[in-house]
């Protein structure tokens, strides 16, 4: 299998959207995760990543230009106990809250759907790494629209 450079792959695309990467370092000793975003609208492009209280948040670069804050301001990466949650939207907090209640990643995401940003209906992408005894497992989910006419989703 050919190993490719993710930055080069993304930079070769005119629009790469949002994405989550979960895996291991080349030597297999460390977990690796990455979250990247690129916006279509001026509202989506008006954001930066900030770190505070052990979490990574998206925040507006220029607060005076925010049009729809619910779609661009959220915790993107958050820890709870031995879990690292990474998502492309405010479902990070949904997963976090469910875990705090003793519930699961899957139960949390069953309460959510794609983003309400017609006509794009941006998929909600979520991942969770669970660390245990020097290794980790992970789960991923994508909630996206199946049929824009009926708004059925998968």
What are these regions (language model features)?
Residues 1-154:
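Conserved short alpha-helical segments that host acidic/polar catalytic motifs at enzyme active sites
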